Structure formats: C-alpha cells, structure tokens
C-alpha cells in the first residue's frame, strides 16, 4: 500500500522505525523483532539506511521482512550523500524486485571522516528523488525542516529546495 493512501485518511496513524543491524549475524534476531513489532499493528514500519554504508546493506532485507513476511506497509529510507548513482540504481532495483513501493529519499549527513571517500554524485535529495521516480512507480517521501535546513542561508532558499523535491516527484513530506 502506498503511504499516501494511509496518510490521506482522517485516521491517526502510528508507525515504527527500525535501524538495521550493523552485522549480518544479528539479522535473524532483527527479523524476530520485526514480527514482534508487526503484532502491534502499526500503520507502517520504516527502515533506516546507514549513511556511511554501516547498516545500508540490510535496509531492503528488513523492509522485505516487514512488507512481504509480516504484511505491513514498509517505508525504506534511501540516502545519497555517500552513494554512487550505480549503488542507488542497484538499491532501487532491489526495492522493485521486493515490491517495496514506499521510499523516504534523503540526502543524509555528509560524513565528517576525511578518510571516507565521497562520490559527490548527489548534492541535494531532489536529485535522488528524480532518479528514484525515473526508475519506477514509487511513493516517495522527503524531509522538510520547518525551522529551515541548517545548511540553508535563508528560509526562502530552504523553500526553494523543498519545491525542487516536490517537482522531482516527492509525494509526501516528513
């Protein structure tokens, strides 16, 4: 189910957010936790994405567990600050294969570690949203900052970037 269908009702929705494990050995335990949380019947469950790749390998797998095993709508986070376009395309393909249609597209934090190589292929989340939209029929969410993004010089600049997200295909903001 597309998240916009859930969010466009007058019902109050409660969701859960999962942080994937850093090591694959913990994955089975996390899948059990997903089942336990699904028993609470949240409207949807979101699965975060490790900005520096620390936990990103298990985002799609846990989102699959949410959607296809526990039958709860899944919202997979996808960040691009430290990703290549090829990596993003690969994740998008995995999401399509698992029929995970809800994606929260985020630029993500820029790693402060000078040893971490940054591909610098995405400057803004709007570019990621455009790539996701062009590669499939996804329900895409984006982040907004009522107080203004810390990197924006003005609220007007922040609103311009917010409009760019919507123009690129963002369907809901959080």
Label for each model-derived stretch:
Residues 17, 45, 95, 165, ...:
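Conserved, mostly hydrophobic/aromatic
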Residues 24-37, 59, 85-93, 153-164:
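Short, acidic/polar
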Residues 80-94, 119-123:
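Glycine-rich anion/phosphate-binding loops
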Residues 53-77, 120-143:
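Alpha-helix-loop-beta-strand connector modules within alpha/beta enzyme cores
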Residues 1-16, 23, 130:
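N-terminal amphipathic alpha-helix/helix-capping segment at the start of soluble metabolic enzymes
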Residues 102-151, 155-157:
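Conserved anion-binding
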Residues 41-62, 109-120, 170-174:
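Glycine-rich, proline-tolerant flexible connector loops at the mouths of alpha/beta enzymes
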Residues 13-29, 74-86, 141-157:
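Active-site mouth loops of central-metabolism enzymes
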């Amino acid at each position: 189910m597309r998240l916009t269908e859930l969010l466009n009702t007058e019902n109050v929705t409660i969701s859960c957010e999962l942080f994937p494990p850093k090591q694959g050995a913990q994955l089975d335990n996390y899948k059990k936790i997903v089942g336990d949380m699904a028993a609470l019947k949240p409207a949807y469950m979101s699965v975060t994405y490790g900005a520096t790749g620390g936990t990103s390998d298990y985002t799609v797998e846990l989102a699959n567990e949410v959607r296809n095993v526990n039958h709860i709508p899944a919202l997979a986070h996808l960040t691009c600050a430290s990703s290549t376009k090829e990596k993003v395309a690969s994740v998008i393909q995995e999401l399509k294969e698992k029929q995970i249609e809800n994606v929260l597209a985020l630029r993500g934090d820029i790693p402060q570690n000078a040893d971490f190589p940054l591909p610098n292929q995405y400057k803004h989340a709007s570019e990621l949203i455009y790539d996701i939209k062009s590669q499939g029929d996804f329900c895409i969410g984006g982040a907004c900052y009522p107080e203004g993004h810390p990197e924006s010089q003005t609220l007007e600049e922040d609103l311009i970037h917010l409009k760019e997200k919507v123009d690129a295909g963002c369907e809901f903001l959080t």
